[in-house]
Amino acid sequence: MWAETKIGDILPWEDVEGEAERLLESTRANARDSENSRAIQEQDDDRIVDRDETDPYNEVIFGRRRPDSVAIEWTSKTLYILEFKHTSAQRQDYRECGEFRARDQHDVLVKSLETVAKEAEGDSAGWTVKLIIFVGGTCGSVHVQTFNSNLKELGVVESKRNAIRRGFVHELLNAQDTVERFE
């Protein structure tokens, strides 16, 4: 996916990977410190488990949990990380829960890109990184104000937003119908 996005033309991908590794190692060290504190209290070293390459957190940037899409606005030098979440609309806070999951999922990637962008020089200088999250409920629920705000951020003209939202809701309902047929 990353080769197709041309992110490497904007920011050196090796730098992004290096920053991600630093963030992941810092997180692991904090987790180990926390686990060590608990282990001392419990006197049970068997419960300490080190993370490895199969760690889902590590997959945020390198594996299956990559973002759904990436959009690049060359004029304003903005890199958009796009994530679409489909969640149960039975709870009133379905949108907030979906947004939290997406932020957590892409935290390392976004922070890595932001750090490398801040340190960039020459043609790579001046880029910003934004995570745009679209959340839809299982029954086609969409928070209109947030959805329109996201489309506005992406530069979609107001006259096109309702049609795009209707298409999004249609896709949500098709996905739900597919799930129900196979249950």
Segments (PLM) and residue ranges:
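Active-site metal-binding core of divalent-cation-utilizing nuclease and nuclease-like domains
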Residues: 3-84, 100, 123-125
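A ubiquitous, low-specificity "background" feature that marks scattered single residues
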Residues: 10, 50, 74, 89, ...
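Short amphipathic alpha-helices and their capping/turn residues within compact interaction modules
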Residues: 12, 16, 111, 115-118, ...
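Polar/charged alpha-helical tracts
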Residues: 22-25, 111, 118, 149
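Generic structural motif
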Residues: 74, 87, 138-141
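Mg2+/Mn2+-dependent nuclease catalytic core
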Residues: 78-123, 133
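Domain-level recognition of nuclease-like catalytic cores that cleave nucleotide substrates
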Residues: 124-183
